[in-house]
């Protein structure tokens, strides 16, 4: 092939490559290769970042606050507002179409609000059953209530399998095996009030070794109140208040101002870092009496500081801590370790002069030093042995020969 023909083929291939690149750039479904060039319009406005849009969508920040912090281009703010309006209008149109479809559909009774009402009716007459044995199954409960209510005089209060609209029993895997066991409670729903009342009367009945506790499913009595921090506190009431989840920028003065209306504050003990001196995230506030710490736990205005929810509870009062006394070791041997006999115990001459008698400790009751194998140490056993001579032994003229 000649050089002219080769140059023509190269020109054709270049044109084909350029056309393919243009098509790839225009096609939104295909990914752009690293070789492809990107054209950037420097005059166009800078759009908001994903983080900024997310904060605006959740309502945590306003456009004015973002503009004051980042100095956003006004064109990008207008574009964001237009996009938000378009999304709202599109959502409203979809809702309107959805309402029309539910009205026009022939099976509209089974959709929308009608289905919700049916579910509410099904879950209206329910009971909560607690203190169940972990081996109890749904069939055990159904058989138990059917057998207990079949002899009731009122037919409406008799329970059958068809009358139980829903039975929810949460289950988890056992620790030592793969078998599934219930969590100790379940919910059971019936068709009418009479059946629910008949089952409620069976509370404290015996099933699988446990006395069942049956309550109305909407009766939440007995649960700890999350807002009652006094009852939720692990420690007994004291004048010390523990405050956790503090910001690192919190100071003693800020804490004192925040809790000063609760009572007289004696001192504030805040854990701080050695290098920066900032708060580690928790502190102890010592009030003059228990009323101050109790008021702080009850006051809802004290539960937030610097925009952070606080974790508060009673602290441990060390002044009320009971110190355990150490029990003195009593020797097993009842015999005295002192010899106070008239002959060996003490010097009578010293006693006659008015001075204190001198006691001599006897070594008879002492235990010999013993090693880990309960054997007397070699240094002690050979202490009284005669020391061998290290001199040269003279020859006796005897020579042993081996054949």
Curated annotation (Swiss-Prot):
Residues 1-35, 75-97, 313-329, 345-361 have a biased composition (Basic and acidic residues). It comes from the Eukaryota. One of its GO terms (cellular component) is nucleus. Residues 1-43, 72-116, 313-403 are annotated as: Disordered. InterPro entries: Nop13/Rnp24_RRM1, Nop13/Rnp24_RRM2, Nucleotide-bd_a/b_plait_sf, RBD_domain_sf, RRM_dom. The modification N-acetylserine is found at residue 2. Keywords: Acetylation, Nucleus, Phosphoprotein, Repeat, RNA-binding. Residues 125-219, 239-317 form the RRM domain. One of its GO terms (molecular function) is RNA strand annealing activity. PANTHER family: EUKARYOTIC TRANSLATION INITIATION FACTOR 4B/4H, NUCLEOLAR PROTEIN 13. This is Nucleolar protein 13. It comes from Saccharomyces cerevisiae (strain ATCC 204508 / S288c) (Baker's yeast).
